[in-house]
């Protein structure tokens, strides 16, 4: 199996390097200064038990030659970049005829729950991955992975439901690469549970580590309410904690704890976009569809957009301004 990791950031970089270390044919897809750095000196994965540098093929797109028929595509870009990535790869030719969208399995190792339906519009064979993987990408050519003793837990299964041999094959490869990789026929139930956990990402990006507990619980409560109204099943915190146990903890790397989650990292890098529209915004969307008020999530969504627009540094959005958005 050949893996193409579309988005070699925190999650994609960790998965790609670990698969490459275990002998798999891996191609990393990146852009800008990060791609330049990977091409020049490889991708360095910093972790609690030491650093390693992967050197292999890196690209910014599918190119002109056909993809091998045994290729597995793993989509790891942020949700706001999904449509562009899908469009770029869907029509890539495959050895033996047909296109990537027609013939190749696509795995979505991303936060949020909107990526899988978007992928299924173009790709015939879509598989979801629920990602619990504490990692950070702030510097070109470098990813810091704090997960220990395993780098992450990756539940995977077919979208919208079920599981098949390709799930089991990819899970075996991920397990050999050090991950905990359960195959689940209800992977979206896990992804909706992870969505609830990710609703605090925007708060952390705005306020840093000093997020009021009541505000964090408020955005989650709104999320639980809209999922209940929509009849969407999800895992709860107790089930998730029991599943992870002590398999994926956090350890310092180079004496430093993980700085912040995925949305915080987007603001810290000055990325110009963040995934709050697909996290808090998903709750807002479901609330509007099912008549459930979601003012806290709407405020976080708007706050992140404002922080991006005004180039507010990560963690430095005024609490008073967020309170005003909350009304």
Ranges and model annotations:
Residues 2, 25, 105, 125, ...:
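Residues at the starts of beta-strands that form the adenosine-phosphate
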Residues 217-327:
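NAD(P)-dependent Rossmann-like dehydrogenase/reductase catalytic/cofactor-binding core
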Residues 52-143:
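Rossmann-like NAD(P)(H) cofactor-binding subdomain of soluble oxidoreductases
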Residues 24, 43, 124, 179, ...:
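Short phosphate-binding/catalytic loops that engage adenosine nucleotides
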Residues 187-227, 250-259:
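Active-site-proximal catalytic alpha-helix in oxidoreductases
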Residues 1-51:
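NAD(P)+-binding Rossmann beta1-loop-alpha1 motif at the extreme N-terminus of oxidoreductases
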Residues 93-100, 143-158, 202-209, 260-268:
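Helix-loop-beta segment of a Rossmann-like dinucleotide-binding subdomain
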Residues 111-200:
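Rossmann-fold dinucleotide-binding core
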